[in-house]
Design a protein with these regions (language model features):
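Conserved nucleotide-sensing/catalytic segment adjacent to the nucleotide-binding pocket
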Residues: 1
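Structural recognition of the conserved hydrophobic beta-strand(s) that form the central parallel beta-sheet
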Residues: 4-13
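Short, conserved phosphate/pyrophosphate- and ester-handling motifs at nucleotide-, phospho-/glycolipid
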Residues: 67-71, 161
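Short active-site loop/helix that positions an aromatic residue
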Residues: 163-177
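Conserved small helical "lid"/interfacial subdomain of P-loop NTPases
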Residues: 14-58, 70, 74, 93-97
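Extended amphipathic alpha-helical scaffold segments
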Residues: 124-127, 174-286
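Winged-helix-like regulatory helical subdomains adjacent to P-loop NTPase cores
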Residues: 77-141, 152-158, 162, 175
Length: 286
C-alpha cells in the first residue's frame, strides 16, 4: 500500500474469487496470486519412498496426502499403510489435539473440549482472535506447544492452521450424527455456513465409502423431501456423484425422482455437477 506495507493472505482455491471481489470493492487491485499446488503423484510417492513408507491402500487417504500438512502428519503419527482416512484423522486428533500418550484420560478430555470450544467460539463470533476468557490455561498451553494454537499478544489466541479447524468440525458433525441417528434431526442440527458444509462433505464422502447403500439412501431421500439449507443439498449431490460406491446407484435408483416436474431435479444435479467440474478444472494445475 501507500505506506509501504505488503500483505500476504493465505486462502483456499474455492475462496479465491470471493477474496478478489472484496479487494476490488476497496479499490485494492494491485495484487498477485502465488499458487502453491498440491503434490503430484510422483512427488508424493518419492517422498514416501525416501521416508521408507509405502503408498497407503485407501484411496481417500492417498488423495489427502497430496496436501503437505496431511503428509507431514502421516509420517509423524502413523506406521501402517493399511489405515483408513477416518483412522488417520482420528490418530492426528488423538495425538496432537488430545495429547494421547503424554496426558492422562482426564487431561485428554480437557484439551479436546478446550479446542472444540475455541473452534465454536471463532465460528459463532466470526472473529479471527479468540478471547482468553473461559478457556483452560493448561490445555491452551499444551495446544500452543503442539503448534495448533498461537498467541496474539494480550488479546487472545488464534488457531494456527485451519485444517485443525476442519478436523474439529468433522468431529463435531460426527457427534451430531451419533447423537441423533436420524437424518432429518441431523440436518436440523447443522449450522448454515460454508465451513460446516465443507466439513460435512468430508464426513459424508467417507460415510458413502464405508457404510451400506441403505444409509446413503436415507440421506438422498431426505434431500428429495427437502432440507432446511440448500448448501447441504449441493453437498449431498456432489459427494454422491463423486462416490465410486454410490454414483451409479443414485441414477438407477432415483431415475423417477430426477425426471419428475419436467426434470427439475436432474437439472439441479447437472448444474451442481457442472460447478464441481469447473472447480476441479481450476484446482488440478499439474
Amino acid at each position: 500500500n501507500k505506506a509501504g506495507w505488503r500483505f500476504i493472505l493465505t486462502i483456499r482455491e474455492n475462496y479465491k474469487e470471493q477474496v478478489k471481489s472484496l479487494l476490488e470493492e476497496q479499490d485494492l487491485t494491485d495484487f498477485e496470486y502465488i499458487d502453491i499446488p498440491l503434490l503430484n503423484d510422483k512427488e508424493l510417492e518419492d517422498i514416501l519412498e525416501k521416508n521408507q513408507r509405502k503408498i497407503p491402500v485407501q484411496p481417500h487417504l492417498y488423495k489427502d496426502l497430496h496436501n503437505l500438512f496431511y503428509l507431514a502428519k502421516y509420517l509423524e503419527c502413523t506406521t501402517s499403510t493399511n489405515i483408513s482416512l477416518t483412522q488417520f484423522r482420528d490418530q492426528i486428533w488423538n495425538i496432537k489435539v488430545r495429547g494421547m500418550g503424554i496426558e492422562d484420560l482426564a487431561n485428554q478430555e480437557k484439551r479436546e473440549q478446550c479446542f472444540l470450544r475455541m473452534v465454536q467460539t471463532q465460528l459463532e463470533k466470526g472473529n479471527y482472535i479468540i478471547p482468553k476468557e473461559n478457556l483452560d490455561y493448561n490445555s491452551v498451553s499444551e495446544l500452543i506447544k503442539e503448534g495448533i494454537v498461537a498467541v496474539d499478544g494480550f488479546y487472545g489466541y488464534y488457531i494456527a492452521h485451519d485444517l485443525y479447524t476442519d478436523l474439529a468440525l468433522v468431529k463435531l458433525i460426527d457427534r451430531i450424527w451419533h447423537k441423533t441417528q436420524n437424518v432429518k434431526d441431523f440436518f436440523e442440527g447443522l449450522p448454515d455456513d460454508i465451513r460446516h458444509q465443507n466439513a460435512f462433505c468430508k464426513w459424508f464422502s467417507v460415510l458413502l465409502e464405508t457404510d451400506s447403500l441403505n444409509l446413503a439412501d436415507e440421506f438422498i431421500e431426505q434431500m428429495f423431501e427437502g432440507l432446511s439449507y440448500e448448501r447441504y443439498t449441493n453437498a449431498i449431490v456432489a459427494s454422491v456423484l463423486s462416490s465410486s460406491n454410490c454414483g451409479k446407484h443414485f441414477f438407477e435408483e432415483y431415475s423417477c425422482e430426477l425426471k419428475n416436474n419436467n426434470y427439475k431435479w436432474l437439472s439441479k444435479v447437472l448444474r451442481i455437477l457442472m460447478i464441481s467440474c469447473q472447480r476441479l478444472h481450476s484446482y488440478v494445475t499439474y
